[in-house]
Amino acid sequence: MSGGESRSPDMSRAGDGCLGDGGDDEESDGDGGEVNPASADAESTQKKRKKRNKKKSKKKSKADSPGEQSSPPRIPLDKLFPSGNFPEGEVLEYQATARTTAAERRSNARQHWEDDTFLRNYRKAAEIHRQTRRWVHETAKPGVSLYDIAVGIEDSVRALLDNAGLETGEALKSGMGFPTGLCLNNQVAHYTPNPGQKPVLLQEQDVLTVDFGVHINGWIVDSAFTTAFDPTYDNLLAAVKDATNTGVKTAGIDVRISDVSAAIQEVMESYEVEIRGKTYRVKPIRNLSGHNIHQYRIHGGKSIPFVKNRDQTKMEEGEVFAIETFGSTGRGYIVDDVGVYGYGLNHNAPLNVPVALPSAKRLHKTIRENFGTIVFCRRYLERLNVEKYLAGMNCLVQQGVVEEYGPLMDVKGSYSAQFEHTFLLRGTHKEVFSRGDDY
C-alpha cells in the first residue's frame, strides 16, 4: 500500500489539459491561409515549454508528500518520506490512566503520620486518656452510678483539652471521640447511661468495661479496659488483655488481617475461668472486630475479627488501628439489646437533605456543625440545650441520614471483658499511643 496520496480524477483532467490539441486558439486564423513555419516553430516550442513547466510543478508537489512505492517495493523509504515524518500508528487509549497503584495512592494519602502536629496531637489525646482512666480506676467502686462515671469521664476529657465544646464547631476541634461506653457483665459493648433512664449502681459482683475515646482534629484515641471487684473474674480479664496485646504485637506493615485474627483467637481460647464452681472456656466474640481509624471516622473500613478467617487484606504503613478484643463466658456471639447507645451522621449522606420535618432540618444542621461524623449520644445534645429532638432524630434515622447504634449483649448470666489499644504503623516501628502502666 502506498504511503502517498492518489491523484483524483480532477487532477488527471487538469494535468491532461496541458496536452490539448490547441482548441479554438489554433483554428481562429484558419480560413485556408498558409501557416508561417517560423511562427509554427515558435508556437510549438512555447507549448513544449509549458508542458515541461507543468511536469516540474507536479514533481515539486510530490516531493512534499510521501511518494508511490514501486511493486515490488525497491525505493528507499527516506526517498519516499524525505521529511522523516512517517505515518503514526494506531492509538489505543489506556483504560486506566493512573500512573500510581492503589496502594501507592493510599500511602500518599497517609503522609500525615510524618507530620509533627499529627503525632503531637495523637500523643496529647493519649495522655488525656491515661490521666482520665486513672481517675476511673480510683472512682469506679460498688455503689457509684454509671451516669456519674460517664459524666465524670467526659468532663475530665473536656477539662484537660481546655475545650468545653459548647460553642458551635468547638467539639469538632477536640472532644470525645464517641460516647463513653460502660458495660456490665453480659453487656458486651455500646451501653451508655442516657438522660431519663433508671440509675444503675455498680455492684460487688459486677464486671465493668470502660470504653471511651479522645479526639483532636478528628484523630481518635480509642482505648478500653475491664475491671472487676471480685478476683473470681481475674482469668477472664487476663485472657482478653493477653489476646489484645498479642494482636498488637502481631500487627505490622504487610501483615495479613487473617494472621492477626488467628493469633488473637489462639491466645484467648487458651484461658479458662471458674465461676461459682463451673469452668468456662473464654470465647472470642465472633461478630465483633477491631478496626482502622480515619479522621473523624472511628471505623475506617478495615476490620480485624477475633477468630480465624480468610481475609488476605494487609495492614499498610501509616495506618492507625484500634486493636480490641472481646471475650465472653457465654455463646461468644452478640445480639442487639434494647435502648439506644448513640447516633452517627452517615458520611455518605448528602449535605442538603430533603426532609419535610422542620425539627429534622434543624437537628441535621446542629449535628453537622457540632459533631460531623463523630458518634454522639443524647447527653451531648442536651449539653447544647437541644430540646424536643426525638421526632427529628427518628426522621433522620428513617431517611438514612443518621445511623442509630444500640447496646450489644451476650446471653444473660454470662460475663464479658474488653481491652483495646490504638497504635500507628510507622516505617520502622509501631507506636502504641494508648499504652499505659495500667494496661
Curated annotation (Swiss-Prot):
Binds 2 divalent metal cations per subunit. Has a high-affinity and a low affinity metal-binding site. The true nature of the physiological cofactor is under debate. The enzyme is active with cobalt, zinc, manganese or divalent iron ions. Most likely, methionine aminopeptidases function as mononuclear Fe(2+)-metalloproteases under physiological conditions, and the catalytically relevant metal-binding site has been assigned to the histidine-containing high-affinity site. It is found in: Cytoplasm. Residues 22-32 have a biased composition (Acidic residues). Its main location: cytoplasm. HAMAP family: MetAP_2_euk (MF_03175). NCBIfam families: met_pdase_II. This is Methionine aminopeptidase 2-1.
